[in-house]
Every structure is written in C-alpha cells, then in structure tokens.
Amino acid sequence: MTSSAMQQLYQQIILDHAKSAHGAVAELSELDEDAAAVAAGLRQAQSHQVNTTCGDEITVRVGLSGAGVDARIDGFAWRGVGCSISMASASVLNDTVRGTSVAESLVMLDLFREMLRSRGTIEPDEEVLGDAAAFAGVSKYPARVKCAMLPWVAFEAVLLQLS
C-alpha cells in the first residue's frame, strides 16, 4: 500500500472512531463505581485529565480482574469533550486494551507514546497497536500530540492507582 493510501486509511479510522466512539458513556454517573462489578471481583478506579493547551477533558474508568501485571482489563468506559483526535484516541484505546493484561497494555502504551513523540521518524507497529497506529501522522504536529495522548495518560494514571 502506498504511503498516501495508508494516510487516507489512517484518517478514515480516526474519523470513524470520532463519529462512533467505542466505550463512551453519555453521563458521567455511568462511570460511578459499579457495585455488580465490585461484587464480581473487579477493582475499579478512574482518572480525569485535562489538556490545558486546548481544553479537551476526559475521564477514564477501568475495571481490573486479577492482580499485578497479569490482571486483565475487563472494564473500560470513558466520558470526554474535545477534538476529534482526543475522542477518537479514547475510542481506539478502549478497543485496544479491553481484554488485555496490564503488562500487554503497558507495552501498547509505551509504543503509542514513543510513536507520537517521534515526529514521524518511527513507523508504527500495527501488529501491536492495531488501530492506534492510525495516529502516527499526528506525531508531525506537536500541538496535537497532547490531544492524542490525553486518554492514554488518563489510562496510565488509572493503572498506577490500581497497582
């Protein structure tokens, strides 16, 4: 596939996720600790993050089953307001980490962060990142990197709370 065709595909993935956000909840109250999930053994936490540059905001709630790096991400929900890039990134994050172990998700987080900080010098590992590789082009626009990273920063903060 040509570079131009790949960029168009990546742009379409971002637009699709921005229009139909996976894992998004309509009301923040839907992120409140779920008694049924706690009874089922899920440990939950949430993080609210703000991009002070543009005003994007997101709250991410994660539910883990198990313990340590082998714990699995069995619950993921988010609520946010912001640009298409930050909202699409949250949707892709939902699809990328749901059902994975904490260890796997941390690898994805590190690869995503490295890709975005590369300013276009690193080719995304599509096999590991899946649709998150679509944000590779964002790395060429430093002001937009914070938008794409916002949900991932919130996710990382939740994992730190739960560890």
Language-model regions: role of each:
Residues 54, 80-87:
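Short, thiol/selenol-centered motifs that function as redox-active sites or metal-ligating centers
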Residues 1-13, 60-62, 71-76, 81:
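Basic/polar, acidic-poor N-terminal "presequence/leader" segments
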Residues 4, 48, 79-83, 95-98:
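Short, surface-exposed loop/turn motifs that are enriched in glycine and acidic residues
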Residues 85-89, 147-150:
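Catalytic-loop motifs flanking and including active-site residues across diverse enzymes
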Residues 47-48, 75-82, 134-143:
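A short glycine/serine-rich beta->alpha loop
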Residues 20-77:
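Structured beta-strand/loop patches that form or line metal/cofactor-binding pockets in enzymes
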Residues 1-28, 36-38, 100-163:
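C-terminal binding/interaction regions
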Residues 89-101:
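Alpha-helical support elements that line or immediately flank enzyme active sites
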